[in-house]
Amino acid sequence: MKLAQGTVVGLIAGYYDVETATGIVRTRARGVFRQKKQKPAVGDRVEIQIDDKGMSYLVEILPRINRIGRPAVANVSHVLLVISAVEPDFSLELLDRFLTFFSWQKVNVTIYLSKADLISEQRLNEIKESLDYYQKIGYPVFIDYHHLEEKIGDMIKDNQIWTLAGQSGAGKSTLLNHLKKDANQTTGAISTSLNRGKHTTRKVELFKLGHGFLADTPGFSSIDLTPIKLNELCNYFIEFKRASKKCKFRGCQHIKEPGCEVKKLLEEGKILHSRYDDYLAMRTEINEGRMPEYLK
């Protein structure tokens, strides 16, 4: 009997594929997890028990950093956020929702603009101008796929787990197919009736990439921000949080308070107006406790 630690890299019909120092072990979870209403997720760091006959069981889930998405991925350290230039149309509002959600989850984000080759040069330049702002406040931005492919291996550090995210139809599975040639994810055309992609990814797996792992998760076009505390929302806009150190009042919400540094920077054009407008819209959403119908 021996114990080994590893990372859950796949779930298949009740079995868990666990990558250990000596290779991938396919194992089952002990019944105790059902009794405790615990379910191992892809990305979980786990301990498995292997008997003398080679039979193995998952016996412990090690402490998680986080657990996000449906299906869930655990211990996500970084998200590669795929935002489409067209089909579906580029949306700063949607970008801000994703960035706020992942900031709340304490997950770093890199932005990738997909389908840039399907729009005019003029439209691309307009989008680039908007994305320049996000790059300046601290988000890495990639528009050229080949540049992303060249850099991503070095960006994924030792045993980090990255996940793809973005609205349906943005091209996550297509991107994964490029990044991991044997991923064999299905790619689907846009559903014209909804202007959303068909949900073509039906399972979550981790793939070795760089020095860690990349997960593929199903696309989703809306994010529920209502669980965020209203007075904490401003902390998840990274440039607001930095500026708030110069606000006159601690806990400034950047609405009508005197001596607000965020409002000052907004008036000076140093904070994007659309970003501030999205912040106000999110405050209303959280205050009312429901997502706007058009975002569902």
UniProtKB/Swiss-Prot annotation:
Subcellular location: Cytoplasm
Chain residues that bind GTP: S114, K115, A116, D117, G166, Q167, S168, G169, A170, G171, K172, S173, T174
EC number(s) reported in the record: 3.6.1.-
Cofactors named for this entry: Zn(2+)
CP-type G domain span: 65-223
GO BP, sorted A to Z: ribosomal small subunit biogenesis
Keyword Zinc appears in the UniProt entry: yes
CC annotations in GO: cytoplasm
Entry keyword set: Cytoplasm, GTP-binding, Hydrolase, Metal-binding, Nucleotide-binding, Ribosome biogenesis, RNA-binding, rRNA-binding, Zinc
Signal peptide as annotated in the record: none
UniProt keyword RNA-binding, yes or no: yes
Cross-referenced InterPro entries: G_CP_dom, NA-bd_OB-fold, P-loop_NTPase, Ribosome_biogen_GTPase_RsgA, RsgA_GTPase_dom, RsgA_N
Highest taxon in the source lineage: Bacteria
MF GO annotations: GTP binding; GTPase activity; metal ion binding; rRNA binding
Function description: One of several proteins that assist in the late maturation steps of the functional core of the 30S ribosomal subunit. Helps release RbfA from mature subunits. May play a role in the assembly of ribosomal proteins into the subunit. Circularly permuted GTPase that catalyzes slow GTP hydrolysis, GTPase activity is stimulated by the 30S ribosomal subunit.
Family under the similarity heading: Belongs to the TRAFAC class YlqF/YawG GTPase family. RsgA subfamily.
Assembly information from the UniProt record: Monomer. Associates with 30S ribosomal subunit, binds 16S rRNA.
Name the UniProt record assigns to this protein: Small ribosomal subunit biogenesis GTPase RsgA
Annotated organism of origin: Lactobacillus acidophilus (strain ATCC 700396 / NCK56 / N2 / NCFM)
Gene this protein is translated from: rsgA
